[in-house]
Amino acid sequence: MPGRITKTLALFLSFAIFAVTILSAQSPTPPSQPATGPGGKQYVNASVTKNRYGKAGEEYWIFEPAEPKPASAPVIVFLHGWGGMNPLYYGAWIDHLVKRGNIVIYPRYQLNLLTPIREFMPNTLTAIKDALARLRTEPGHVKPDLTKFAAVGHSLGGVLAANVAALASESGLPRVLAVMSVEPGITEPPINVPLADLKKIPPEALLLAIAGDQDTLVRDVDAKRIYKESTRVPANNKDFITLVSDSHGQPGLIASHRAPTAFDLAYDSGEGIGGGPAEVLGGNRGGSDSAGGSDRAGGLPTRRIDGSREGRPDRLETMMVNALDFYGTWKLFDGLCDAAFYGKNREYALGNTPQQRFMGVWSDGVPVKELKVTDKP
């Protein structure tokens, strides 16, 4: 009798797995990365040069465009979420930004999970200033174009990005022309991440505050606060945007708090996923490494999780790269920087335009749910 029950259970499980597989195969798939335009895979550089400097909470990485190596390039400060000290968590996004011709500075700002919050902003500013000085004076680097300076951050880094824009002038940093805070938080008790006086953000800056409709961790509280408190930035230079989840196909597009992460092992600092202080302290601080990063022109390497393809690892499914990146955060920030630096592609980032709201099309021709854009959050 037990043997018969076991066989029956095994048969049932096999049928269930088969049914799920067939159902998944019949489900529409999400859009892949567009060929051109903001968020697209038309890159001006084929590889990325990676350098790591500093120590403890003042450590930072510099990622520079290569193949070909430009004489100069705009500078983007990328600020990770709490605990995201390892660049691998945002590696695919960093790769995208650098191959578009930008230098990316990635401040660590916290040695480990025990670093006091009060140290985050001083560590960030120190790292940025040191990185810019190194880029300007140390041989072999791409020269930083300090007239084209931007900041982007996710979660706690979204608050820090807004702070960088507000404190740039008094801190001796270049003027921030574009700033995007993605699912920022948390300035409320008991976390109490300090938020600078955002009235100091100059009116010529372009600003986006972004929330996810399934972000149950930070919600939209601080995104709204950043939008509302940046009072000198006129409404036509900023937008409040909500990423909208869509489960029309498989895998679904879920705008959770982890949606903006973009896992890529090519950007692993050596600490791995959730690496501790022991690995951090044992790492190289000044070596360089040129690597091709994620090749989006052909087959995507397994080191990067792509949500538009099958076989995503369940453990890291919330860090997959998908249309919420290509048509959401990546497109928006590309357009914002293009508008601020070169006076083009503004319609992809600002103004509640069709290009800004568009999120691609499922494989069955159904449009992905559009972004929600407002200037009255």
Predicted features along the sequence, with ranges:
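Gly/Ser-rich "nucleophile elbow"/oxyanion-hole loop immediately N-terminal to the catalytic nucleophile
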Residues: 67-71, 118-156
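C-terminal catalytic-base region of ester-bond hydrolases, centering on the histidine
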Residues: 227-377
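Bacterial N-terminal signal peptides
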Residues: 10-21
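Short glycine-enriched nucleophile-adjacent loop
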Residues: 158-170
